[in-house]
Amino acid sequence: MALLSPPSPPPPLPPLRRRPASPTLLAVATRPSSLLSLPHCHCGLPLPSTANARAYSRSSRRRRRVAASLGQDEPGVSDTAVAPEGEGDSEPPASSDGAAGDIAASAEQPEASPEDLEDIRQVKRVLELLQKNRDMTFGEVKLTIMIEDPRDIERKRLLGIEDPDEITRDDLADALVEVNEGRIPENRVALQLLAKEMTEWPDLEMEAPKKKSKPGKSVYAKATDTGIDPETAAKRLNIDWDSAADLDDEEEEDDETEVPSAVGYSALYLLTAFPVIIGISVVLILFYNSLQ
């Protein structure tokens, strides 16, 4: 029976080696925080335990030694004072009331002069007249204003005139829209040109001819007898009478004037008798010459 030898003791552990931290990590780790007024004052910060406090002190001493070996100043002991909270490069945000006031001041339009108000009244008066006399809507007036004279376009092209500050037809249309909406146009030059052009509208005061209340007979229906009674045809088709075949006794009396039949056919007889008269005259002249 073999004797059991006592267990051999475990081999001794090698001593721990401490490696200095790299300068990049050291700079990141030792950057001063703006949240603390003093770099090493931790009196007001509660530590979770005594072990953590010891570990923190050891790490602080280690950072000091590494910084001294690299020839750098200790970042934590710098004399630079940290600005208190709320101060620094960043300016305090502007209040919403101040910003709204600036926007309102910039958006405020200059006061309108009496000439501008007179131009606006002229434009509105012309719009009312066009709607009353010409039955034109605002869209039709706007499209008419936007049409540019082709003669002006050709003249500018031949002369090479290109003025970027010139008032265009679109500017006039925008001014017309603003006047129609009850606002004062910002472009006062466009307002003046618009008022001048609107007042020079041709035949502005002349009223449009009134349309007939009932459609009358067309020229073809008056001159041609189709042999179809329009009233009977409309009853069979169950539709309204066609304007080309509508019979209106009152309109017929107004349009047609009574002419005697003798006067009407006399012109036809006279034109027909001219060749006969000429032929008879030639025969008589020849017969008279033959007798001599």
From Swiss-Prot:
Feature: compositional bias, Pro residues: 1-15
Record key words, sorted: Chloroplast, Membrane, Plastid, Stress response, Thylakoid, Transit peptide, Transmembrane, Transmembrane helix
Compositional bias (Low complexity): 49-58, 94-112
Main location: plastid
Annotated TM spans: 267-287
Subcellular location: Plastid, Chloroplast thylakoid membrane
CC per GO annotation: chloroplast thylakoid membrane
Single GO biological process annotation from the record: heat acclimation
Location of the transit peptide in the chain: 1-67
Span list, region Disordered: 1-119, 206-225
Membrane topology: Single-pass membrane protein
Family: Belongs to the Y3IP1/CEST family.
UniProt function note: Involved in light-induced chloroplast development and growth. Involved in the plant response to abiotic and photooxidative stresses. May be involved in the suppression of photooxidative damage.
Protein name: Protein CHLOROPLAST ENHANCING STRESS TOLERANCE, chloroplastic
The organism of origin for this protein: Oryza sativa subsp. japonica
